[in-house]
Amino acid sequence: MLQVYLVRHGETQWNAERRIQGQSDSPLTAKGEQQAMQVGERARSLGITHIISSDLGRTKRTAEIIAQACGCDITFDSRLRELDMGVLEKRQIDSLTEEEEGWRRQLVNGTQDGRILGGESMQELSDRVHAALASCLELPQGSRPLLVSHGIALGCLVSTILGLPAWAERRLRLRNCSISRIDYQESQWLASGWVVETAGDVSHLDAPALDELQR
């Protein structure tokens, strides 16, 4: 059985400002750095062998902090990037027009072909994050990888493993530096392949922060 841990990046400046990030970027806050250190402390006891991270700055920094604690090398994979949110990236949520807010709501309310102008659909996101996950099956026997990615990306990954469509209503909360675990297994009482063991664990954090889409 292959165990894969999933970690959302630490709190960023734009999270705190309720600003849409997508594939744009902002640095971790002091709280975000502390959250990443707490993940590192937890990960040190999990036997992590590989860290694979989105190549955006906020995930790279989170991965670097975790890697220092684990003593692991980091591989960067652009397929683990956040959903491309097109023309709304860098905008504060409270500043959106009614039309723009309608685009954003399509990403959370179950609109099958929803997307922000200039951005990705949830199905496109799902296809690439699943491709990144499938690469973990090529790691050496006994590996235990930890993937560092983003809130919508990881939420889509976990939800689709559970059998939901990529565009399903968004009802899974993954806070900054939460830890989830998925396993690739063969069981008599579970469907073969990927299963969800835990999702959104924040028991290792002193004060989990809310992101801009969860307030």
From Swiss-Prot:
Alphabetized UniProt keyword annotations: Glycolysis, Isomerase
Enzyme class: isomerase
GO CC, any one term: cytoplasm
GO MF annotation terms: phosphatase activity; phosphoglycerate mutase activity
Catalytic reaction list: (2R)-2-phosphoglycerate = (2R)-3-phosphoglycerate
Site (Transition state stabilizer): 150
Keyword Isomerase included in the entry's annotation: yes
EC numbers: 5.4.2.-
Pfam families reported in the protein's UniProt record: His_Phos_1
GO biological process: glycolytic process
SMART domains on file: PGAM
Catalytic center residues: 9, 82
PROSITE patterns: PG_MUTASE
Matching NCBIfam families: PRK03482.1 (NF002901)
Similarity annotation: Belongs to the phosphoglycerate mutase family. GpmB subfamily.
Name assigned to this protein: Probable phosphoglycerate mutase GpmB
Organism name: Salmonella paratyphi A (strain AKU_12601)
Gene: gpmB
